[in-house]
Amino acid sequence: MSPTDNQHTHTDIQHMTDIDLTGVFPAMTTPFTPDGRIDYDILAQNAQRLETAGVSGLVPAGSTGESATLTHDEHIDVIETVIDSVNDVPVIAGSGSNSTREALNLSERAADAGADALLLISPYYNIPEQAGLKDHYRTIADAIDIPQIVYNVPGRTGTNIEPETVATLASHRNIVGYKAASGDVGQISSVVEQTRSEAFSVLSGDDILTLPICGLGGSGVISVGANIEPAQTTAMVGAAVSGDYDRARNLHYQLAPLFEHLFVETNPIPVKAAMEYRDYGPGTLRPPLTDLSDKHRKRLESILDDLDADREMALAGQTEVI
């Protein structure tokens, strides 16, 4: 039975007026049963597992959570389930849309459910101009008084949010961060430089670029890989933001094969397969996404086995604990 069926309410929850965006924020998967229904019990278990591993927050109902194939009610149910399942970590709810009105509605519902912050993907398919992007984000930020993160992923949306646009939006008191998934390190560097005077955080949206982005002044990552290796990813980012780049590099190189392979096919296809291999839940995807190819699955399982072997050696005192 879904949270809506149980009539959960969150009227007693006070929204956070601030949020620390330092560290690792897993972009959570949404587990589905073989017939395509959401498995809320496994979703709750994964939220608790990630909190126990020491992550800084959780991000349900985003791209990795297959938000594009969730109904609006399912979208909110997923967010509520994660909120109800954890104790202390903030929940950053994915609530973007290509329609400003729809994004505003989803964001209001997420805030009412008790989300601590919002992650807002830029409008996709309709390809707005920079002025339209500014209006879109300001409309939501003016209406909803909780922290909001601008999410730039032009490979999915068809629109790039220019650094100057981000810098303008950063002056709004409710727009507190930027998820960088353009793959353009030069552009990300420009965003960091132009927002340094603001109370504003730049987060990697691409695991393999997390270390260089932290080196530029970024504060962490909204991570796919942390669904699989939360403690190790947290250790890497912690080392990077504290300036221990030797340790951060070592951890990066250990995790890099996983980070790269999780995007060998469309996200979240590989991470769903990895979740299943680690017994973190079913690998079921909603159409039109399809299962990971046998070739890529075999390589993924080899990478996961290598990480497990490294961990066993570390526990035996033969290598550095990762």
Please name every model-derived segment:
Residues 38, 214-322:
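Structured C-terminal cap/extension of enzyme domains
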